[in-house]
């Protein structure tokens, strides 16, 4: 009765919901119900809301993840509208280099990238985190304005967050 694509979508949704619930619990936030599937009011956009942050969470079983700059722009827009800090989290959920990473909007001196996305490899990010707590830094252009992004491990993000 159910096709493979329906089962796959349901399992992806359950996979994402499990990630969101776990992170929301750890951060003391609330999960946005069916955030990717409904046209919710903008105050609930984003996967997780805390008192000070609005988070968008992505998860993959692949060893590669494509970060779309449009996703960064959306979470920034939703967060700032409600006076919250935008946080974009992506997770490599399987494989030798599984880990979570957080993108924060921070100034930097990088030249703006011209592409619309960035491909991350779990192995590359894992190696980079051994060298520095700041795993990656870049700039992209959003509606004519350059936005600096810093990528940290989720563990380091928790340290930053708890020291504020």
Segments predicted by a language model, with ranges:
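Catalytic phosphate/metal-binding cores of nucleic-acid and nucleotide-processing enzymes, i.e., regions
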Residues: 1-164
């Amino acid at each position: 009765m159910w096709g493979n694509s329906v089962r796959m979508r349901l399992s992806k949704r359950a996979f994402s919901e499990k990630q969101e619930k776990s992170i929301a619990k750890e951060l003391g936030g609330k999960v946005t119900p069916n955030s990717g599937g409904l046209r919710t009011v903008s105050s609930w956009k984003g996967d997780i809301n805390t008192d000070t942050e609005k988070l968008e969470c992505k998860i993959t079983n692949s060893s590669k993840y494509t970060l779309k700059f449009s996703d960064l722009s959306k979470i920034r827009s939703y967060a700032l509208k409600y006076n919250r800090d935008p946080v974009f989290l992506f997770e490599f959920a399987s494989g030798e280099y599984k880990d979570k990473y957080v993108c924060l909007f921070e100034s930097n001196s990088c030249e703006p990238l011209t592409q619309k996305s960035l491909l991350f490899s779990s192995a590359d990010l894992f190696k980079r985190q051994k060298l520095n707590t700041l795993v990656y830094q870049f700039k992209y252009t959003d509606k004519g304005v350059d936005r600096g992004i810093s990528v940290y491990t989720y563990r380091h993000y928790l340290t930053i967050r708890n020291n504020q």
